[in-house]
From Swiss-Prot:
Pfam families: 7tm_1. Residues 377-427, 480-512, 665-698, 751-774, 1087-1117 are annotated as: Disordered. Autoreceptor for octopamine, which is a neurotransmitter, neurohormone, and neuromodulator in invertebrates. Probably also acts as a receptor for tyramine during ecdysone biosynthesis. Required for the biosynthesis of the steroid hormone ecdysone which is necessary for metamorphosis. Involved in activation of prothoracicotropic hormone and insulin-like peptide signaling which is required for the expression of ecdysone biosynthetic genes. In the adult, expressed in the inferior and superior protocerebrum, the posterior lateral protocerebrum, the deutocerebrum, the surface of the subesophageal ganglion, the lateral cell body region, the cortical layer of the ventral nerve cord and the optic lobe medulla of the central nervous system (CNS). Also expressed in the nurse cells and follicle cells of the egg chambers in the ovary at oogenic stages 1-10, and spermatogonia and spermatocytes in the testis. Expressed ubiquitously in the embryonic CNS. One of its GO terms (biological process) is G protein-coupled receptor signaling pathway. Its main location: membrane. This is Octopamine receptor beta-3R.
Length: 1256
């Protein structure tokens, strides 16, 4: 019975099912059986105890080893106590043996097993702890990735919707699909990604029930399919917009777009909600498994649903998108090729027409030049004359010189088209313009000039002479040759023959022309002497023979007055009709042939031989009449009208018109010619103002260069030119008019003369000025009166001359035709004529105050004021003249107050530039002409910002908000027109005084409220009728300027050529500096002048603060230098990468094409953006749908890891996040809209701009 008690004790203490011990105790077997049972029972118990203990310890890994040992020791103690206190009535041999031996055997067996199990438990606990930390890290990482994708998708697509709603520019039909796509992507993130993330983060358990499992699967399929169908609709929209643009407005209407969007949102419901809730999508086994395990939400589909849903959701829309974008890509490539071919042909045709300059029909322009049919004659001379343009190329490698060196031309065949694709409206316009500008003479011949031989004049080639012409040419009287050389130093005369527009007879004597003021008669282009006479090619003997015959024939007709000097002579080519007459024997028919030229003819050849020109008294100080009336920006239509009026032989009155020597109007008015420096300056000034087109004729360049030259050089340079004026109503011969007193008075108006008008002429106020096109001068007295009234006579010849030019920004508001096309060069203010030393006088000779003037101010008669011989009046823009007020002793601090405006109504440009004061000299610091090669300028100019009202923005005095206005007092700077990237519309500020009877003068300039001038606050008499007021937050400007910006350089004009499209520098073998690139950026809206002044003012005020310790300032300078060095290294590496990339980095133009190389339209750019979206869509969803179809068709035969399935799902979801990022990166309109929206929604992202402009 003891065995039964031991079994009961073990069952209650150890909870072990010891069934073998109970069976052995209840059996009443024999002694042998009992003995065997007693030997087997302890071993069985020991095995059960050990295994049970091990199982117990392994099933409770959190329990510690001492607790387990104590529990076993207590069990063993109770076990021994029970064994020893058994009942005596049950004493037997079996019980006595069990009580004595089994207890010690049990203890000896359990002890070693417990020690071994304790070591195994410690190792298992450490390994499981490491696995738990790894699982927790993976869980946190997955949660971060899932939440980031979801937030980016929701916020990005919401930003797309808000931006389109706020920006009216984005409200186009295509963006309707974009907004709908953004809505679908945002719902994918909210309804599909969130449920999937919860399942993955919870270990695969579904916590929302079976119904929500179906909802989740339906929403996932629905929104994903809707997003893909939106991309398909966008591709169709782009296809019609680019490939079929004519059908696009008819097909893509609002009704069509609404119908497409309705299908996009309805069709996915047919493959998502309906089959999933009805149970059509899966198998019966999967439905039973879902009912048995509601905590599982797996999406298992059958083969039919897999094929249908994948086709509707991905395969069909993907194929449609591929086809559409392939067609779009092919069309875009075709258009780009056509665009490139057209641009190349336009360039070639422009060069071709620039050399030929030949209208298409000579008989149309001049139907009566010759009476014989020229068709056969043209065919005979075509072989010799068609290649002249190849023979007359200039001896330079630059392409810019080719279009200018077209002075000596013989007619060539009409320019032919190089390809069919080159037909362009600009070609037709160019051809029409060439017809208009060369109506005077179709061949555009060069008039023969008698000049002194120079070192590079043409050498007479070895000719093949016509014997008859050569014999007649040798019979030239020697007295005429001596008569020709009798006046070597006098002004040279332009000799030519005349041909009327109606017939080929000479014009009558009454319509002869006379010479006036030959000083500057050639439109400031006398300096291109060496550019206009080209060397003849030596490789075409036939061409040389024709030119030599032409020269000798013309020499014979003019009586042999033109000879070849020691250095060679200049040859004038006749027109094509004269060549025809020469070959047809025109000399025998009794008709005198005339050579047509572009300039007006002075007189017949006989008169020119009989009456050589005498020097005009006072001609050294003559005045260019063309700078008064002919230097206006006329369009081609106006020029054509003027030339037609000139050719009409009627009595409408006299008029005069002049053109440059065989130059196009665009070349003449843009100042072409004069060397490479002039062309470089023209490129730099071409895009200074955005209020005019780059190719608009500009008359100010030639005048400005002319005004900066000394009088002696001008006389020497332009002594060969003549000025042509038509005095048809005069009955006196031309030589008598030249010696008349009126002409002397006319010349004295611009020379040294004591005559001064005390007051401005009342008849020439700005509204009463005559129109440039309708100005008629009947006599020289009227012309002299106009000149005298529009000029400033000398007041004191001994004083320093006050140079005047025709560039200014101070424009009269009541007579404004168009603003100047070029920026203002540096201005120099000469305070006093008597108080000026020789160095200041020399500086005044080299620079100029660039102003327009209409009438002299009251202080114009002050001593020291002297107009130069190049003073001009432009009828295009008339402005007021700020003149210095005479001060006995000039004060450098108050020198800038002398600039005042004599007009109460002014127009101020919105681009403001500071003026540097260095002694008596004032310069425009930021003007691009400050660094001109022909003007002296310093490399570094510092602008002081403290004291008075100095400094832009008034960074001197007290901190706060100050305004930049124009007032009466406190003038420290002068408004100058400058070239800047910050250009607005013309801002008009009109000032007037109440109860003012007499003309008052209001000074111009910037006045700061933080200045020491307290009387500026009294503006009771100031009436502002409208203008721009610029406010500067000085504290914010100081914060911005204190930020380290690296190395900054002074703005210097770039030597690189300018892009004809955007005005930026065209990069060559080396890159430009970072400052030049930043300056050319048109998106920078901060005024550079204000920035420069604020920066320099802050740098000047920093040493005065004295609040920083020496260590802090030294460390700041150290890090500033380090930052500057890193910036410079980065810029050098960037330039090194762009070393071999030529062309404009802004618009893509390479310098030769008229259009940009990357000139896609807006539709092409939208197609490119959406094409990138389509590519990203394919990369994201294609792997998922491949897995989806393969696993659905194969079933259990194609197993796939769960991790791969999760990765494929979230790659597809990531497509919804990438779409807004693609919009922001590739589409500039969306990028700007995103920036504006973020600045409005999030105030912390708003840029703090201290410069604000308000319209008052």
């Amino acid at each position: 019975m003891s065995g039964v008690n031991v079994a009961d004790l073990l069952a209650t203490t150890m909870t072990l099912p010891i069934t073998a011990a109970a069976g052995a105790a209840t059996s009443q077997a024999a002694a042998t059986s009992a003995t065997n049972a007693s030997h087997l029972q302890p071993a069985t118990l020991t095995g059960h105890i050990s295994t049970t203990a091990a199982a117990k310890t392994t099933t409770t890994p959190t329990s510690s080893l001492p607790i387990t040992s104590q529990f076993v020791d207590a069990s063993l103690t109770s076990l021994s106590l029970t064994a020893t206190s058994s009942d005596a009535s049950y004493s037997s041999p079996f019980s006595s043996y069990l009580s004595s031996d089994s207890t010690f055997e049990l203890l000896s067996t359990v002890g070693p097993n417990i020690t071994a199990n304790g070591s195994d438990i410690a190792v298992d606990n450490q390994a499981e702890l490491e696995e738990s930390w790894l699982d927790l890290s993976l869980l946190l990482l997955k949660g971060f990735i899932f939440s980031s994708i979801i937030l980016a998708a929701v916020l990005g697509n919401a930003l797309v919707i808000i931006s389109v709603q706020r920006n009216r520019k984005l409200r186009v039909i295509t963006n309707y699909f974009v907004v709908s796509l953004a809505m679908a992507d945002m719902l994918v993130a909210l309804c599909a990604m969130t449920f999937n993330a919860s399942v993955e983060l919870s270990g695969g358990k579904w916590m929302f029930g079976p119904f929500m499992c179906n909802v989740y699967n339906s929403l996932d399929v629905y929104f994903s399919t809707a997003s893909i169908l939106h991309l398909c609709c966008i591709s169709v929209d782009r296809y019609y917009a680019i490939v079929r643009p004519l059908e696009y407005p008819l097909n893509m209407t609002h009704k069509t777009v609404c119908f497409m969007l309705a299908n996009v949102w309805i069709l996915p419901a047919l493959i998502s909600f309906t089959p999933i809730f009805l149970g059509w999508y899966t198998t019966e086994e999967h439905l039973r498994e879902i009912s048995l395990h509601p905590d599982q939400c797996s999406f298992v589909v059958n083969k039919a649903y897999a094929l249908i849903s994948s086709s509707v959701s991905f395969w069909i829309p993907g194929i449609v998108m591929l086809v559409m974008y392939w067609r779009i890509f092919k069309e875009a490539i075709r258009q780009r090729k056509a665009l490139s071919r057209t641009s190349s042909n336009i360039l070639l045709n422009s060069v071709h027409m620039g050399h030929t300059q030949q209208p298409t029909s000579l008989s149309y322009l001049h139907p009566s030049d010759c009476d014989l049919n020229a068709t056969s004659a043209r065919e005979e001379t075509h072989s010799a004359l068609s290649n002249l343009e190849d023979m007359l190329q200039p001896a330079t490698d630059e392409d810019d010189d080719r279009d200018e060196c077209d002075e000596l031309r013989v007619p060539s065949p009409p320019p032919r088209r190089l390809s069919r694709s080159s037909i362009d409206l600009r070609d037709l316009e160019q051809e029409r313009y060439e017809k208009v500008t060369h109506t005077d003479s179709a061949p555009s011949m060069m008039a023969l000039q008698q000049q002194q031989p120079s070192h590079n004049q043409l050498q007479p080639p070895a000719p093949v002479f016509n014997p008859q012409i050569w014999t007649e040419g040798k019979m030239i009287p020697s007295k005429e040759l001596d008569k020709e050389h009798s006046h070597p130093n006098g002004p040279q005369q332009q000799l030519s023959l005349t041909s009327g527009s109606g017939n080929s007879e000479p014009e009558p004597e009454s319509t002869a022309y006379r010479v006036f003021g030959g000083l500057n008669s050639d439109e400031s282009e006398g300096n291109d002497l060496y550019d206009t006479h080209l060397p003849l090619a030596e490789d075409n003997k036939e061409l040389k023979r024709l030119i030599e015959d032409n020269y000798l024939y013309f020499k014979r007709q003019t009586g042999g007055t033109i000879i070849s000097g020691p250095g060679g002579g200049k040859y004038a080519a006749l027109s094509e009709t004269d060549f025809i007459r020469l070959k047809a024997g025109a000399a025998a028919c009794g008709r005198k042939a005339f050579a047509s030229s572009d300039s007006e003819f002075l007189r017949t050849i006989s008169e020119s031989r009989a009456l050589p020109e005498q020097p005009v008294p006072g001609k050294e100080k003559g005045f260019n009449i063309l700078s008064l009336l002919s230097k206006t920006k006329r369009s081609s239509t106006e020029c054509f009208t003027l030339e037609k009026k000139r050719h009409q032989a009627n009595s409408e009155g006299s008029s005069f018109f002049r053109r440059s020597r065989n130059r196009k109007l665009s070349h003449s008015y843009n100042g072409c010619g004069g060397g490479k420096e002039r062309k470089l300056e023209r490129r730099q000034r071409q895009h200074s103002d955005t209020d005019s087109t780059p190719n608009k004729p500009d008359i100010l360049l030639d005048i400005n260069v002319l005004s900066e030259q000394s009088g002696a050089s001008v006389i020497q340079q332009f002594s060969d030119g003549v000025q042509l004026i038509d005095f048809s109503e005069l009955k006196t011969p031309p030589e008598r008019i030249r010696s008349d007193d009126e002409l002397a008075q006319l010349a004295d108006c611009f020379g040294e003369s004591p005559q001064q008008p005390a007051t401005p002429p009342p008849s020439l106020s700005p509204p009463e000025l005559p129109e440039p096109s309708g100005l008629l001068i009947a006599s020289s007295s009227e012309l002299a009166e106009i000149f005298r009234s529009l000029s400033f006579p000398l007041g004191r010849p001994a004083g320093a001359p006050q140079r005047l030019s025709t560039l200014s920004d101070q424009v009269c508001a009541n007579y404004l035709m168009s603003p100047p096309n070029t920026p203002a060069p540096p201005a120099i203010s000469v305070p006093n004529g008597g108080a000026m030393d020789s160095s200041a006088s020399s500086n005044a000779q080299s620079a100029s105050i660039n102003v327009y003037f209409l009438s002299p101010p009251p202080h114009a008669a002050a001593p020291g004021y002297t107009p130069s011989d190049t003073s001009t009046v432009s009828l295009d823009v008339v402005t007021s003249l700020p003149m210095p007020v005479p001060v006995p002793q000039p004060n450098p601090q108050m020198a800038s107050q002398s600039n005042i405006s004599p007009k109460p109504e002014i127009i101020l440009d919105s681009t403001l530039s500071p003026v540097e004061g260095c002694g008596d000299e004032h310069r425009d610091v930021t003007s691009p002409l400050f660094k001109r090669k022909d003007s002296a300028g310093d490399a570094d100019v510092s602008v002081s910002g403290n004291g008075g009202a100095g400094g832009v923005g008034g960074v001197g005095g007290r901190q706060g908000r100050c305004s930049i206005l124009a007032g009466y007092d406190g003038i420290q700077t002068v408004r100058k027109r400058q070239a800047s990237v910050v250009t607005y519309d013309v801002n008009v500020i009109n000032f007037s005084q109440e109860n003012s009877d007499s003309r008052s003068y209001i000074p111009m300039g910037r006045v700061s409220t933080s200045s020491a001038k307290h009387e500026f606050s009294n503006k009771s008499s100031l009436i502002r009728r409208g203008g721009i007021c610029i406010f500067v937050d000085e504290e914010e400007a100081e914060i911005i300027e204190q930020r380290p910006r690296g190395i900054t350089f002074a703005a210097v004009p770039s030597p690189l050529p300018k892009c004809p499209l955007c005005g930026a520098d065209i990069s060559s073998t080396t890159g430009t500096t970072a400052n030049a690139t930043a300056t050319a950026n048109a998106d920078s809206t901060i005024d550079t002048t204000v920035t420069t002044s604020s920066k320099r003012s802050i740098h000047e005020q920093t040493p005065d603060l004295g609040q920083r310790p020496a260590s802090s300032s030294s460390s700041t300078r150290f890090w500033h230098k380090r930052t500057a060095a890193v910036t410079a290294c980065w810029q050098q590496s960037k330039n090194r990468k762009r070393r071999f990339k030529t062309g404009c980095s802004h618009c893509g133009a390479t310098g030769g094409s008229v259009r940009p190389a990357k000139g896609w339209k807006a539709e092409h750019k939208a197609a490119r953006t959406l094409g990138i979206i389509m590519g990203v869509f394919l990369l994201c969803w294609l792997p998922f749908f491949l897995w989806y179809v393969i696993t659905s068709l194969c079933g259990p035969a194609c197993p796939c890891p769960d991790v791969l399935v999760v990765v494929l799902f979230w790659i597809g979801y990531f497509n919804s996040t990438l779409n807004p990022l693609i919009y922001a990166y590739f589409n500039r309109d969306f990028r700007e809209a995103f920036r504006n929206t973020l600045e409005c929604v999030l105030p912390c992202l708003e840029k703090r701009n201290p410069y604000n402009a308000y319209y008052v």
